[in-house]
Amino acid sequence: MQLRCPICGKPLVRIERSAVCENRHSFDYAKQGYINLLIRQSVDHGDNKAMVQARTAFLHSGSYEFLRNTICQIIQEEPCNTLADLGCGEGYYTSSFPVQEKYGFDMSKEALKYAARTDRSSQYTVASIFHLPLPDDSMDVCVTCFAPFADAEIQR
């Protein structure tokens, strides 16, 4: 599945450590492996490092393991090849989903640094869940855990 340029909507093609569209809009992959497709750059998008560390510690305490396991069971009940986790944070849920192609989207670079470093089985992208860089009808399943519900994007 090809991501779409957040500026013009054309498909992005990976060329070494960048993704480029036919209109020559270019986006670099971070050394951790995620790509930033958020158009408006700001230092305070999403969670900061301390918030990510606190949530990661809490999630790894096992408090929400039952929820993660339940979601995985539901996903396994239907054939599913592609999944988008909207507001994926540090990838706690994304990394465990039993799907071949997994995509995590979040506005927090700090969260995605952690996610991409610890989960090489998923593709992580800094992007707004209300303006996803995905082609129409490209995902079998969309999951949102403790993030705003982007109904229009999920339906698309």
Region locations from a protein language model:
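N-terminal auxiliary segments of SAM/dcSAM-dependent transferases
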Residues: 1-45
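A short acidic, Gly/Pro-enriched loop at the edge of an enzyme's catalytic core
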Residues: 130-141
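A short glycine-rich, Lys/Arg-flanked "PGG" loop and its adjoining helix->strand segment in the class I
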Residues: 151-156
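Glycine-rich helix-loop-beta junction characteristic of Rossmann-like nucleotide cofactor-binding loops
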Residues: 72-79, 132-133
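Class I SAM-dependent methyltransferase Rossmann-like catalytic core
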Residues: 44-66, 70
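Class I SAM-dependent methyltransferase SAM/SAH-binding core
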Residues: 82-131
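Short catalytic micro-motifs in class I SAM-dependent methyltransferases
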Residues: 141, 146-149
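Short loop/turn motifs at secondary-structure junctions
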Residues: 79-82, 138
